[in-house]
Amino acid sequence: MHLQTYGKSYIIRLYASWHAKKGEKREFKEEWLMVTAVVGANWGDEGKGKITDMLGEESDIIVRFQGGSNAGHTIVNDYGKFALHILPSGVFYDHTTSIIGNGVALNIPDLFREINDIVNQGVPKPKILVSDRAQIVMPYHVLFDQYEEERLAGKSFGSTKSGIAPFY
C-alpha cells in the first residue's frame, strides 16, 4: 500500500492480485490493478475534486461514492470553468467512465441539469453509470430542509437547502 498526502486529503494506492487456472494445475500470476482513492480528512473544501480531476486524465473509471448536491467542486479545464455537485470529475475525459455509487444522495433533476450544463459548454456527452442502489433525494427532502431553515429564522444551521440534512 502506498500513501501520499496532499494537504488534508489522502490518496491511497491499493494493489490487488489474483491467480488463474490453467487446466488442472493452478498457477499463480501477479497482476497489478491500481486503485487510487481520494479521501478527505475534513468536512470538505480540501481539494478532493481538484486532485480527482488531475488523476482523471490517467484513469479509466472515476467513482463518486457518497455525498450529494449540497457540496461542490470547481474544475477549470480547456472547456471552461465548471462547478460540479453530483457528477464526478471524470466526466471531462472521453476515455473515462464516471460512476455514481450507492452512497450518493442523488437528486435526479440536479444530475440532468449538470449533464446538460457541461454538454452545452462543449464537453462531449460523458459515459455515466448510476448504481441501482443509489438513494434518491425526493422533493419533500428539499422542502423539509427549506422549512427548517425558515423555522430557525436567523439561527439557521447553514443548510444549502438542497435536502441533504433531512435525507440523511
What are these regions (language model features)?
Residues 2, 6, 10-22, 30:
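Short, positively charged and aromatic/hydrophobic N-terminal segments
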Residues 33-168:
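Non-transmembrane, aqueous-exposed alpha-helical and coiled segments at domain scale
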